[in-house]
Amino acid sequence: MSASIACVMIEDFAAAAQGIAGALPSVLVDYRQRRAKVAAASAAARAAGVAPGMSLMRARALCPKLTPHPLKLDRVEQMRERTLNALWTFTNRIEQAENRMPQTAVLWLDLGPTHDDDAARIGAQISTTLGRMGLPASVGLARGKFTALAAAGQAACGVQLIARGAEADFLAPLPVGLLPLEREDARKLDLLGVRTLGHFAALPRSAISAQFGRRGRLWRLLASGRDTRRVKPTRMPDFERAGFDFDDPVAELVTLDNVLSALAVTLSRRLESRASQPTKSR
């Protein structure tokens, strides 16, 4: 058994939630602040240097052909809930990363001890499920959260599995910026000429401790593929919901009974997947 954690990465999450697509440069703008700020940017806008967090004025200076759209947080939250509901059919142990939202959704799923073939199959099912929702997803599979995240970043809307023991070799050529660095930490590493995870992992532990303290020691472990951090599950809702829309009025009770039975089976499977029992239905 190898892979136990799946990382799901959905680029342009907010744009997908609001139905904004296309190759033109565009941004979603948060107008709630005194100065309008970019909340998410399309690939074309990012290529011009536009990034989440910068002011709309600066974004327009970098990309004069930019098209701004207002950020609709209610739509983003609805899509987040739909995404979680879809992923909860695979496991009830899911952690969300908030630091990249709403530009990118990143979620970790604890699959438990899983053979590589089974993990790859689950990863493909996750990708297909989200794709049907209009959410192109990249899925990384590994034994640790950091390696799974790095694998998702390399999967290009596909599935990439890192086998047990291959973590360090996979991570070595990747940029050191994948580590959770503060701006000043990144500047120090750049001055030292440390560009890759492999280079960072090869630094003496004493030197890393002297420069970065406890967090540096954690980064060294992550860069080496040794990540023992557990998935911190998001609390699941206290209810499940399923429905069916009839094209025409129901004339026979048999039809209604069949539909209700099918919905009951669907709800039962969802509850079983999250180790819950129904207490009330309506």
Predicted regions mapped to residue ranges:
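Residues that scaffold, gate, or flank divalent-cation-dependent active/transport sites
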Residues: 1-109, 113, 120-128, 137, ...
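A structural signal for the main folded, soluble domain(s) of proteins
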Residues: 90, 162-169
